[in-house]
Amino acid sequence: MSRPEWFVKILVELFPGRFTFARLTNLPVIGRVIDYGLFNGDDIVYLPRDGTIQINAPIERPHSAVLPSRIVDHFIEQASYRWVMDFCLCRSGNTCQTYPIEYGCIFLGEAVKQINPKFGRLVSRDEALEHAQRCREAGLVHMIGRNKLDSVWLGAGPSQKLLTICNCCPCCCLWGIIPQLSPLIRDKVSRMPGVNVTVTERCIGCGTCSEGVCFVDAIHVDGEYAVIDETCRGCGRCVEICPNEAIELSVDYDEVLPAMIERISPLVDIS
């Protein structure tokens, strides 16, 4: 059953308390209840922006390199139903001043027919592809996968028929709560297969990359160099912001698209 407007307004008001909510997931009983109710069966992948990535494919086969945006385009093209939100819940709740609040998520699958029409609209394949492209041009990072939380707050189910494509900013993304979440939930949000983020010897420890750039605060300066910890989800923002081009993001194989199709397709039926 689709959610009324007042329900979403309450969520927007509660959004600033998301970090407290995340810490509750570490309590033994409460954490399991939250996981089952909001995150059961989830598998969510952050996709680095195309311009940040180096494909480690053989030189004689450059055509085989698949950019991360192609993964998003593939699922949009395959879906029978496509929905574009008129707003981003995260940016609305955080009153974002940097990125467009009106650039909302894309949802795919039959469950979108249950979303309140006041929140967005059904779109054609081309309209969805254009929306995704606008989001990329605005500097937003895609996240794709099954996210039961979206099914719950939208009242659109079952979650097995709702594929989420979020367009995330570093300042407002809900998943900035990852460092506070229990491992059980935290590990359901991962980087794209094969992604490696490396700080090179060109780093001078200026700290630019650690100043509100990483949405999970995975990078910091230790002594004279930047250090990336295990919470990194490979979004590539630090690569873009580094003034010395000292951070590199690469993919260590050229079969990203087949791997992502194989991983996501069994999770959500978008036919």
Predicted regions, residues:
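Residue-level detector of anion-binding/catalytic polar loops
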Residues: 141, 238, 248
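Local cysteine-cluster metal-coordination motifs and their immediate loop/turn environment
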Residues: 86-100, 163-176, 201-216, 233-244
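N-terminal cysteine/histidine-rich coordination modules
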Residues: 261-262
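Ferredoxin-like iron-sulfur electron-transfer modules
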Residues: 148-165, 184-234, 248-258, 267-271
